[in-house]
């Protein structure tokens, strides 16, 4: 039996996480992750300094920043359309615009360059835990993601997620918002 024959395609939840921006009331960085179990080890949000990020106001007055191209982007559209790497019965993913519309609507206030986000600080989801608590929060950083073969426009990262028995990283950076 080939190893591939023993593989099984399973579904799990992906999540959107809003990271409060320190010293900005009701302003958040919005990140989508397909690996929510890594959020406990989250230490930095990476942005692409060359991209435009939308500044969106939701119906509750909260302001969100995420890659402008992702507002109407249909995540995993190719996999859904081809039924390749897609489980029967799992619905098509909604765009961010659809999600905000379903929750009362939104208004686009403008856009900012990714470089304008560098240096802002956010509050991580587990910063209240002693092991995660770092004075001042974690800064946005400028990383050359493309050079590292990562094409997502924003993502959360972990420190030392571990390695398998042959030395490969167990957790690698995935698609983000």
Q: Across the structure, where does each feature detected by a protein language model lie?
A:
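NTP-handling and nucleic-acid-processing catalytic cores
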Residues: 1-177
